[in-house]
């Protein structure tokens, strides 16, 4: 299952690179080791793929207030779960996002 998710994520990034008009939004809910959502390890693999393909993560404000390059994307985290702070925030800092 993990390999399948990584393949789909990589294909989505590659499709984005060839579509100059789209700004994709990747929506996450829980990111933790015990949920049925994404584990921190899988989320980190997603961030590595984003870096590998030189994607730029932007905020909603940046989306509305500046010219967006073709490699821009949004990462969103719904519902304000504590695991977003515990697991996601340190990984985003680690990868300068």
Show which residues each predicted segment covers.
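Catalytic alpha-helical scaffold of carbohydrate-active enzymes acting on polysaccharides/glycoconjugates
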Residues: 3-97
